[in-house]
C-alpha cells in the first residue's frame, strides 16, 4: 500500500510503501483501543491521595467525659471518626492504580490506532522533521499549512533538538521519538505526523 510523502511545506515529494498489517487493518477494534487507553491513564495516575486514620490524626488520647452519668452517648476518644477533627474511616490510601495488560494487546492497540488515523486521512508521512533554528513562530507557520488543531509528531529513534524546542510552547503539539508512540496521544490529537524513519522503525517494531 502506497501513500504520499510530504515536505514540511505540505507539498508532495514522493511515495512510500506502508505495511497494510500495521497501517491499514480492515476492521478497527475500538474495544482494544479503549482498553489500552484505560491502561495508560490508570498507569499515569499518581495515587498519592490519602486521609488520616484514628491512629494518625493529631489530638489527645484523653477520654472526653466520664463513662456514665452525663446523659451523652459514651465516647472513648476525641480522635474517633464521628468526632469533629477526628480520623477518617475507609478514606483513600496511597496506592498504585496501574493494571496489567498483555504486551500483545498493547501492540494491537497501537496498530489499530495508527490504522484508524490513516483511514481518516489524518496520518501523514513527512520526509524530514528537522528545523534549522528552534523558532516557535517558524514551526507554527509550518503546522498551519496542515490546517489541524492538534498534532502528535513521531520521529525516528531520536528527535531533532530544534524541532523539539520549537514545539514546547505550541498548544496541543507533542513530539516524541518512535519509542514514545502511544495509543492515547495518537487518538487525542487530530493529526499524526510520521517521519520516514519513524515509519520504518515502527514497522519493524510492530511486525
From Swiss-Prot:
GO annotations of cellular component type: ribonucleoprotein complex; ribosome
Q: Which GO terms describe its biological process?
A: translation
Say if the entry is tagged with keyword Cytoplasm.
no
Bilayer-crossing regions: none
Q: Which GO terms describe its molecular function?
A: rRNA binding; structural constituent of ribosome
Entry keyword set: Ribonucleoprotein, Ribosomal protein, RNA-binding, rRNA-binding
UniProt lists the family membership as follows: Belongs to the universal ribosomal protein uL4 family.
Q: How does it assemble?
A: Part of the 50S ribosomal subunit.
Q: What PANTHER family has UniProt attached to this entry? A: 50S RIBOSOMAL PROTEIN L4, LARGE RIBOSOMAL SUBUNIT PROTEIN UL4M
Q: What does this protein do?
A: One of the primary rRNA binding proteins, this protein initially binds near the 5'-end of the 23S rRNA. It is important during the early stages of 50S assembly. It makes multiple contacts with different domains of the 23S rRNA in the assembled 50S subunit and ribosome. Forms part of the polypeptide exit tunnel.
**What is the protein named?**
Large ribosomal subunit protein uL4
Amino acid at each position: 500500500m502506497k501513500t504520499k510523502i510530504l515536505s514540511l511545506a505540505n507539498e508532495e515529494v514522493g511515495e512510500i510503501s506502508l505495511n497494510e498489517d500495521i497501517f491499514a487493518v480492515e476492521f478497527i477494534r475500538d474495544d482494544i483501543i479503549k482498553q489500552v487507553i484505560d491502561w495508560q491513564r490508570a498507569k499515569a495516575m499518581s495515587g498519592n491521595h490519602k486521609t488520616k486514620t484514628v491512629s494518625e490524626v493529631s489530638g489527645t488520647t484523653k477520654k472526653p467525659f466520664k463513662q456514665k452519668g452525663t446523659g451523652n452517648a459514651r465516647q472513648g476518644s476525641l480522635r474517633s471518626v464521628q468526632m469533629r477533627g477526628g480520623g477518617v474511616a475507609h478514606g483513600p490510601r496511597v496506592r498504585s492504580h496501574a493494571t496489567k495488560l498483555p504486551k500483545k494487546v498493547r501492540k494491537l492497540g497501537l496498530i489499530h490506532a495508527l490504522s484508524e488515523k490513516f483511514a481518516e486521512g489524518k496520518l501523514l508521512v513527512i520526509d524530514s522533521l528537522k528545523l534549522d533554528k528552534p523558532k516557535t513562530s517558524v514551526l507554527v507557520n509550518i503546522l498551519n499549512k496542515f490546517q489541524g488543531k492538534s498534532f502528535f509528531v513521531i520521529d525516528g529513534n531520536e528527535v531533532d533538538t530544534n524541532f523539539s524546542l520549537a514545539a514546547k510552547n505550541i498548544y496541543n503539539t507533542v513530539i516524541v521519538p518512535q519509542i514514545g508512540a502511544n495509543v492515547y496521544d495518537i487518538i487525542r490529537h487530530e493529526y499524526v505526523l510520521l517521519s520516514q524513519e519513524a515509519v520504518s522503525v515502527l514497522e519493524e517494531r510492530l511486525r
